[in-house]
Structure formats: C-alpha cells, structure tokens
Amino acid sequence: MIEFDNLTYLHGKPQGTGLLKANPEDFVVVEDLGFEPDGEGEHILVRILKNGCNTRFVADALAKFLKIHAREVSFAGQKDKHAVTEQWLCARVPGKEMPDLSAFQLEGCQVLEYARHKRKLRLGALKGNAFTLVLREVSNRDDVEQRLIDICVKGVPNYFGAQRFGIGGSNLQGALRWAQTNTPVRDRNKRSFWLSAARSALFNQIVAERLKKADVNQVVDGDALQLAGRGSWFVATTEELAELQRRVNDKVLMITAVLPGSGEWGTQREALAFEQAAVAEETELQTLLVREKVEAARRAMLLYPQQLSWNWWDDVTVEIRFWLPAGSFATSVVRELINTTGDYAHIAE
C-alpha cells in the first residue's frame, strides 16, 4: 500500500514549504446544503458559527438545551474543531411553538439563524463546502502562484485526505487487523471508520497509479465516466473514445476510479484490468470489504475546485478561496501547493 505522503502528485511535488492552520482563523469552512429551510415541519434547522468545539459536542449541547435526546439532533457532516466553521444542525422538536434559540449559549458557538423544516438532516445531505484558507511562511511564492494557475485548468487528485485514515493511520491499521484476524467488530463507529478507511486507501492507490501515466485524463476503453456533478456513470467504448475525450477535456465528463467492494466495479476491458492490477497486492482489504458487504462505487479521479481565487497578503502569506463538492478534501488541494509538516489527520472532513 502506498503511504499517503507518497501518493503521486498531479503537478509534481511542491518546491516550497508553508504552514496550514497556524491558527483557527486560517481555516474557515462554510457549509452549503444546497437548499433553504422549508419554514414549516417538525424539525428545526439551526445554522451555527463555531470555533474551538467539534460538531458532536455542539449537537449534544443543543439537545440538552432543547431537553430532547441527543439522537434527535443530526447534521450533514463533521466540521473541524480547530477551525472557524459554519454549519447546520437539525433538531426534531414537534409542535407549533418555536423555541427561542437565541438563548442558546455555548463558548465558541453562536446561533446565526434557525427555521422550521419538514425533513431530518441526514449525514452527507449537503451540496458542498466553501473554504477560505490562509497559508503562512510560504517559502516559494512563484511556485505556489504557478500551481494555483495550473490547478484552475487541470484540477487536483480527488484523494481522500489523511483525516479519513485517522491519526497515525489508526483507522487503516484497524481495518488491516480486522482483515487479518476475522474477529467480529461490535462497535458500529469502529466498523464504519475502518471500512471507510479501507476502501478510501484502495481508491487513493488506484488514482496514484493512474497519475503515473503520461496523460492522466486520457480516456481508455472501458473507463467509467461520470457527468460532472452527478453520481451516475456509463462505460466508454472504443467507438466513442474521440467524442468522449472531447467532453472530458471540456470537463463535462469525469473519469472515475473505483471504491472497491462487493459487486461489479463498473469498468470493463482495459480500464478494469488497470484497476485490478493497481490493487492486486491488497487482497486482505478487498476481501474484508466483500465479506462485510460494502458495495463497490465510483468516484471522480480528479477534483476541480470551483470559484478558485487567491490574494497574496505579502510574499509569504496567501489567502485562498474555493468551493468543493461534498466528500472532497481541502487538504488535497493544499497538498499540491506546499510541503507542510502539519498533521492533516486531525482536520475533520
């Protein structure tokens, strides 16, 4: 298995160093649900601004304030504790009376707005996130500037970030131990984290191998292609390669890589043979995913940050803004810009 730090770069290894998250204000995340509250219903959507507290902690505090069980408060995704983040929480509070959430007080947390909603907010039910990052002590401004320009055109690898694998790779190590011993894992959270780490690591490896090709965005026979921004995909055939390549170049279509699991992977012929070869030695993790009935899926191989802009405060400090779809990692963008000694594993997805 390729170590995360050794995964192939799309733009080559960065020439300079820098600091990510010298303080929480250097990492700002604003959640984009992609819809507005209904204005009625048995649930209440609450938009919060937080700094220094994790999502679950705030959700539990909100449940206590509303005098409801903690399981009645949900959210679309975990947001980093050591960052400034805006996100929505959802509390099930039936009845016509609206609680006064302006009275909710928690250090490091502020209620920005709230409204009634018809449906529970479920994990993953968001469109994406807007990021504002500040990189400090940048040692090579020219290199970072050119990389930002290149990313606008070519994107970055859509790797799962180090945070998916746990601090020190603990989630992936747990998956490997589980695969080797076949001992039942009763803890639902551990099961989820370990299985997610296993398929994410296999996906990263397949993408890393594909990036070693001279033209990483070259459509090959049997590739599974996805309409940009959609989940559905179809298989490329030899007769269509020229037209499909044009649409990939226009970023209308995206080449995908497999999230291994049970069932067919989706690719065929040349593309399938390539994916199978890329993870041929990782039989234990593949067997684990099949055994635990984790279904195979597809994910775009490259990621194109939307609304990408940047501003140099001085020669060693740059503020970068961009929007990413749900499930993608800001740290995968930063990785293509600078070498940093910071540990990404503590940054929530």
Swiss-Prot record:
Recorded GO molecular functions are: RNA binding; tRNA pseudouridine(13) synthase activity
Q: Which CDD domains match?
A: PseudoU_synth_EcTruD (cd02575)
Q: Which UniProt keywords apply?
A: Isomerase, tRNA processing
**Species per Swiss-Prot/TrEMBL record:** Escherichia coli O81 (strain ED1a)
- Its name, as the record gives it, is tRNA pseudouridine synthase D
Q: Which reaction does it catalyse?
A: uridine(13) in tRNA = pseudouridine(13) in tRNA
**What's one Pfam family here?**
TruD
Q: Which residues bind substrate?
A: 27, 129, 329
For this UniProt entry, what's an example GO CC term?
Answer: cytosol
Task: Name the gene for this chain.
Answer: truD
Q: What is its EC number?
A: 5.4.99.27
Q: What lineage does UniProt assign to this protein's organism?
A: Bacteria, Pseudomonadati, Pseudomonadota, Gammaproteobacteria, Enterobacterales
